[in-house]
Design a protein with these regions (language model features):
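C-terminal regulatory/interaction module of P-loop NTP-utilizing enzymes
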Residues: 1-295
Length: 295
């Protein structure tokens, strides 16, 4: 498969950064460059970072910029090839055989209508129309990672009843990892890699203003300061960008309904903290945190 030297409408990392911004995703220069190179070189893009920094949103935005459908494969412990590739619709196959009665031996039960496509097979069959997102690959086991490595080597699978299916062009593949475990070095070598950090305060404020409609700049700045303080606390789950956006929206909504700003932030704390122990830990500290954030 030929390497892509150009991408329609995206001639540089800066052009991709601008296109992502138009799709309401604020990428920095490092991320837009990594994504551009992955697309141009025809290599998978591996995005690592803490939960909530925008890895999955980046994949969605890239698919939107390319005008393609996002095929999301959510990984979990115990995921296997059947969940990622395909299954046969056994009940429909049996129904088709029963309906034919004595002629059942002439029924082809391996036609497309009986094939249940999973994301990886769909990507192979329609690579020009899709972006494959393999989300949270670190949650899968080493066996699935080995299977994935083989898939990424030649973008081909074999269905015993149908033969080999190979992508006619190199698909766009994005992998994400929260780094709960180390990925195999061979998998990393096949990818263009980028680590997504928590955004700098000014950039996080711009993200909130872009994604949270109706939020005033003062409220956005207060959220950024308060969330930054929360991230320095020993919490089970530190708030990510999505929680910051939702907190800004929730506090603004309560303020519009008559709550004063500090109370609006205090009452909507469950939007930004999603763990009981974290709420208990922060409760006696929230007033000082809000005061420090100049709420």
């Amino acid at each position: 498969m030929a390497v892509r030297h150009t991408i329609v409408g995206i001639g540089s990392p800066r052009a991709l950064e601008d296109a992502l911004r138009a799709a309401y995703y604020l990428a920095d220069d490092e991320l837009s460059t990594a994504a551009y190179l992955a697309l141009a070189l025809g290599k998978p893009l591996l995005l690592e970072g803490a939960p909530g920094v925008g890895k999955t949103e980046a994949a969605k935005a890239i698919a939107g910029v390319l005008g393609r459908t996002l095929l999301r494969l959510q990984c979990y412990e115990g995921i296997d090839a059947a969940a990622a590739l395909y299954e046969w619709n056994f009940p429909r196959q049996m129904l088709a055989l029963r309906q034919q009665g004595d002629s059942a031996e002439h029924v082809d039960i391996y036609r497309d209508e009986f094939l249940i496509e999973r994301p990886m097979l769909a990507c192979l069959r329609r690579p020009e129309d899709t972006v494959l997102l393999i989300d949270e690959i670190d949650r899968s086991d080493h066996e699935f990672e080995a299977f994935l490595l083989e898939f990424l080597s030649d973008f081909q699978i074999s269905i015993p009843e149908r033969g080999a299916i190979r992508a006619h062009e190199r698909p766009v593949v994005i992998l994400t990892s929260n780094r709960t475990r180390e990925l195999h070095e061979a998998l990393r070598r096949r990818c263009v890699y980028h680590w997504i950090e928590d955004p700098a305060p000014e950039r996080e404020m711009r993200i909130i203003m872009m994604r949270a409609s109706g939020v005033a700049e003062r409220a956005a700045r207060a959220v950024v300061a308060a969330v930054g303080r929360l991230r320095r606390e020993p919490l089970a789950k530190h708030p990510g960008i999505s929680e910051a956006v939702e907190w800004a929206q929730a506090a603004t909504l309560l303020n519009q309904q008559g709550a004063r700003w500090p109370d609006a932030f205090r009452r909507s704390l469950g939007v930004v903290l999603k763990d009981e122990d974290d709420l208990v830990h922060i409760a006696p500290r929230i007033d000082a945190i809000l005061q420090e954030a100049q709420v």
